[in-house]
């Protein structure tokens, strides 16, 4: 079925080069969009300059092109949207939905990652403070297309969460919700490491009156040492001369398969065939997938 209203996206962070785990997520989002004639947008989530690796942005773009993952429209960089984030932050602050927090990491030790609310009613000034969003004592539920039903009690399991850091950098949760709405994203396909973030995003979308996308979280690729493939663990970058072979391997990770005769095809030919055959129902219904299973 063709659905020209489908708008998906891939949103890498330039803290390092793309690796095989990145490819699995990018491929899933690309094929899910292309299989129904939808649009696939690219957004660079460059919110944290101190963590950005030199040359990573250009390397990411080159890798996507070499692997045939051509996006629609212009690249969006979050670093160009600070004015929009600040306007939203001020709106939430003015409505009493956000507040300044001066808690140090030491003060929050022992809280298990759940903010205990020390500054909730303190009335601190915004200067030299993080900004937190008040959360309700409610359970947020959603149905993920692969992971199934998921629920989270925001008050008990998360607590009031940061939407701008103390150093002035905007937090992922704020930026991703605003940018998805601004770009008209109605289908989010990404790694299962972000499953736990989704209820926070649903709550913020609800507060702001934004439409809520459909979500699909694909399994993370786990290395033999138990760590996920990721930039934090120095996973090897995708080589430029093995696009077709690694795309076929990524298809296997997503429960899809390609005939042997496509082993010598170009990346574009393989992707065109894969988009016609794409079936999201075949994606393994697990959060983690051992890399050793894909060899």
What is the role of each PLM region?
Residues 100, 105-240, 258, 294-295:
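Active-site cores that bind ATP or allylic diphosphates and position pyrophosphate for catalysis
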Residues 19, 81-86, 173-174, 178, ...:
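Noncatalytic linker/hinge segments flanking ATPase motor cores
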Residues 1-15, 128, 138, 227-295:
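Non-catalytic terminal extensions that flank enzyme cores
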Residues 1-113, 193-210, 262-265, 269:
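N-terminal Rossmann-like or analogous alpha/beta NTP/dinucleotide-binding catalytic cores
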């Amino acid at each position: 079925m063709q659905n020209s209203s489908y708008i998906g996206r891939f949103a890498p962070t330039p803290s390092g080069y793309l690796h095989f785990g990145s490819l699995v997520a990018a491929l899933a989002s690309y094929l899910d969009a292309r299989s129904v004639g939808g649009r696939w947008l690219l957004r660079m989530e460059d919110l944290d300059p101190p963590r950005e690796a030199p040359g990573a942005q250009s390397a990411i773009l080159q890798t996507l092109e070499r692997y045939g993952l051509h996006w629609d429209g212009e690249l969006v960089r979050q670093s160009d949207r600070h004015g929009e984030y600040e306007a939203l932050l001020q709106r939430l602050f003015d409505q009493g939905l956000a507040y300044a927090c001066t808690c140090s990491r030491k003060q929050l030790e022992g809280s298990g990652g759940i903010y205990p609310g020390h500054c909730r009613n303190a009335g601190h000034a915004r200067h030299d403070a993080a900004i937190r969003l008040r959360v309700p004592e409610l359970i947020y539920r959603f149905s993920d297309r692969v992971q199934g039903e998921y629920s989270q009690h925001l008050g008990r399991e998360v607590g009031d969460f940061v939407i701008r850091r103390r150093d002035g950098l905007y937090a992922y949760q704020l930026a991703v919700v605003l940018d998805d709405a601004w770009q008209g994203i109605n289908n989010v396909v990404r790694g299962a490491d972000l499953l736990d973030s989704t209820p926070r995003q649903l709550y913020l979308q609800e507060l702001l009156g934004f439409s809520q996308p459909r979500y699909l979280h694909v399994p993370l690729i786990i290395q033999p040492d138990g760590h996920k493939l990721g930039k934090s663990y120095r996973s090897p970058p995708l080589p430029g001369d093995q696009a077709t072979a690694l795309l076929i391997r990524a298809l296997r990770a997503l429960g899809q398969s390609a005939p042997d005769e496509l082993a010598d095809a170009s990346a574009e030919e393989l992707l065109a065939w894969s988009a016609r055959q794409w079936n999201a129902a075949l994606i393994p219904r697990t959060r983690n997938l051992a890399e050793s299973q894909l060899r």
